[in-house]
Amino acid sequence: MIDTKKFYINGAWVAPLTGSEMDVIDPSTEQVCAVISIGGQADTDAAVAAAKAALDSWSQTSKAQRVALLKKFLEIYQSRNEEMGYAISQEMGAPIDMALTSQAESGSGHTLSLIHI
């Protein structure tokens, strides 16, 4: 079972400030396949504040730097493709091949299109 209870805010994995947890049920087995946090207003406010604070420096990032970051992201994303396909398969109850092609692999295509803009 995947245990995903933290949020990635301002460059770090942080525990929720408010909110609750929710079980994710695999519809093919009706078993809990993950436990996730449901953030509250304070969590949203913290994420938005971090994004606003990052905007100034990010807006000064060159196209070449952004492309390099996207390429690194794509490398990591593709290295975890099977893991993502498995998680998607569990949360949707979909066959693994469908989860891989319709969900996990489509992210690679979207990222490649951004790299080539």
Per-segment meaning from a language model:
Residues 1-115:
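N-terminal Rossmann-like NAD(P)+-binding subdomain of aldehyde/semialdehyde dehydrogenases
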